[in-house]
């Protein structure tokens, strides 16, 4: 047992205890992808605003062209309207003729306006997207599984390796992965989980929160998972690790990176259990 490699502040932020030997581990991509997209969005927004302020100052007008071009057309028309001949420009063009000419001349600005609107809404799209469904580890039934887009990915490790840490590690074959944009100590713990249908492709699932609760969180998380799965009474022995002791720096980052207007995607317990039982019936292992 390697309890010295992890503590409750790390585990409680990454793992949820469900009871009866089952835990859920959060997905790395919840925060990793949002963090990358959020910073790109933020920097691009600032860049657009500064560029527009010091050059054309046209973003607001372009948005008006996209939302309601008549606002801009009427505004410009009043600037060219002949006070001696209401409804006509100095050049003698009627409002309808002027409108047609302006729509043809500034049609491209409607596309720019639509782009700015969608770009501003991008952040809203991110915050309405729920957090991904976590991966479950069932110590009593010796299962590792998760549900994704109607597909069950499941692994059943043999009883012979459950109490042997090295053999269990060899069977699960986890990996450590760090995206090139991240420092090595901010990496994830990756499990390759087979599809319930052996003829279909397995899924590599990065685990652990981003931003990590500590450096080399992936190593600490692996040690905990191995200890938990190898324990005879995991809920009692490791229950103390599921309660946070204090607030840490990564909490502030993670509130931003993982904020969502909707709760995390959960499991349909009855449907999931039925699929697991059907899979176990076909793939019994002692």
Residue ranges of each PLM-predicted region?
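Terminal and domain-flanking low-complexity segments
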Residues: 1-41, 47, 196-286
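N-terminal topogenic membrane-targeting module
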Residues: 12-23, 68, 74, 80-103, ...
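Alpha-helical transmembrane spans
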Residues: 28-132, 251-286
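Short, solvent-exposed secondary-structure capping/transition elements
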Residues: 127-129, 156, 237-238
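A short, compositionally biased
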Residues: 130-132, 139-141, 184-186
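Short, mixed charged/polar active-site loops
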Residues: 132-134, 152-155, 199-206
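Phosphoinositide-dependent membrane-docking surfaces
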Residues: 142-144, 151-179
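Hydrophobic alpha-helical transmembrane segments and immediately flanking/interface helices
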Residues: 173-199
């Amino acid at each position: 047992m390697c309890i010295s490699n992890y503590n409750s502040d790390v585990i409680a932020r990454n793992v949820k205890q469900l009871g009866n030997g089952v835990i859920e581990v959060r997905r790395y991509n919840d925060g990793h992808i949002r963090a990358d997209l959020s910073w790109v969005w933020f920097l691009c927004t600032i860049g657009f605003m500064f560029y527009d302020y010091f050059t054309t100052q046209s973003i607001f007008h372009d948005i008006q062209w996209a939302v309601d071009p008549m606002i801009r057309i009427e505004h410009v028309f009043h600037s060219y309207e002949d006070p001696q001949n209401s409804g006509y420009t100095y050049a003698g063009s009627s409002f309808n003729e002027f409108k047609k000419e302006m729509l043809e001349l500034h049609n491209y600005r409607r596309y720019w306006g639509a782009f700015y609107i969608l770009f501003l809404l991008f952040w809203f799209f991110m915050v309405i997207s729920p957090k991904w469904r976590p991966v479950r580890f069932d110590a009593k039934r010796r299962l590792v599984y998760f549900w994704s887009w109607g597909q069950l990915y499941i692994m059943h490790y043999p009883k012979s390796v459950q109490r042997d840490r090295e053999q269990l590690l060899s069977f699960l074959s986890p990996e450590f992965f760090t995206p090139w944009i991240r420092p090595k100590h901010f990496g994830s713990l990756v499990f390759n989980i087979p599809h319930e249908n052996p003829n279909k492709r397995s899924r590599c699932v990065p685990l652990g929160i981003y931003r990590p609760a500590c450096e080399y969180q992936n190593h600490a998380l692996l040690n905990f998972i191995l200890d938990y799965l190898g324990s005879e009474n995991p809920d009692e022995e490791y229950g103390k690790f599921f309660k946070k002791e204090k607030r840490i720096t990564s909490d502030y980052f993670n509130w931003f990176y993982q904020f969502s207007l909707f709760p995390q995607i959960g499991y349909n317990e009855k449907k999931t259990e039925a699929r697991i039982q059907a899979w176990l019936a076909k793939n019994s292992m002692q």
